[in-house]
Amino acid sequence: MHYVSTRGEAPALGFSDAILAGLARDGGLYVPREWPRFSAADIRAMRGLAYPDLAIRVLTPFLGGEIAAPVFERLVREAYATFRHEAVCPLVQTGANTFVLELFHGPTLAFKDVAMQLLARLMDHVLAERGQHATIVGATSGDTGGAAIDAFAGRSRTDIFILFPHGRVSPVQQRQMTTSTAENVHALAIEGNFDDCQGLLKDMFNDHGFRDRVSLSGVNSINWARIMAQIVYYFSSALSLGAPDRPVSFTVPTGNFGDIFAGYAAKKMGLPIERLVIATNDNDILARTFATGEYRTKGVFATTSPSMDIQVSSNFERLLFEASNRDAATVRRYMAGLKQSGAFTIEAAEIAGMRSEFDAGRADMDEVAATIRSTLANSNYLLDPHTAAAMHVAADKAGAVPMVVLGTAHPAKFPAAVEAASGVSPALPAWLGGLMTFEEKYTVLPSDLKMVEDYVSRRARAAR
């Protein structure tokens, strides 16, 4: 199993090198050279497996034999032992043919834990085997940062620096990043929005001198292992609803396109998914793109679902690569247009192919609040704002097959928005009860590449 860049000008890498690299040196994103395939009989044989066993079955083909089976099994079991639900990602019925896939039972109450707990252990294992250290830099619109810090805190082979938009994350999200006492954790509040943070991250990866000097690695969903780990819960939920003999559809709250691309990967691997529905908030670039065929950025609008307040969806590049029949030159042309003018037009055949796999819709803040209220009244189920956006869109896209809405965060991560909508104040689980009283530790920096690189260089052990 080898991994190739979406831009076609970086060397193909094995699994271990691909996850340590994060972003390819040509600015592209790594994808498998070919998709593993499971037959219907293979998928039937997965029925009844516990979540860790299912993860081992689904993910092993991606390793290319680079991690010994007993080691990988141990890392997977350790990762999912951190979750506080026996099913890891349980499925809850909220309507006649509607289900919420609860992805928020991990240490930081967000779906990012599902991938991050495994990624941290995989990276730690590879670095230890090689006797190396790495500097992790990540950008977050809220949940990625807390999940990454929890997963990497105290690990001897990595220092982690998380960039988040100053004043644009929820209080719970901020404290999950700023209250760690681990010496290898650095929270950086950037004066700007998430796209500024993500732009700094990409610029650091594209500064090859800096990248090599600090042994830079990334844990954003540009890292293939993040996408890979998320494929598993598409299999687990579909199996619960009768796959492979019964198709299912999924609606996914979408910002950076990583979570829904994992669903696309599951479909490429043989899972019978009828529709993949993209749900956006007021920052609706993906819904507009599917409607018009033109990807055009606008300003970012702050909403009650901040993890979706994004205009540059990094993982959309992976879909462009697939839709163009893996024509890296086409992807490079699109990305050049995005950099030069903030826009590009997708070829007619390619957008038609995308529309055959995906639907897209949006929910504004009033619709999100109304959906939180109605779901509580009708189903006695409390949604966070991101899941509510998906639930609103899912209602418009309902069909004959079961619709699984991805529940991406616990409502207590967004108490102000949830209480304003429903009148109910969601409480943090007891085991996180002290979070809001812990002392914070973070540094405010301008959106300036040199200042951020200097800060990282002075503190990264790999640079010494």
Where are the regions that the model predicts?
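PLP-dependent amino-acid enzyme catalytic core
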Residues: 1-464
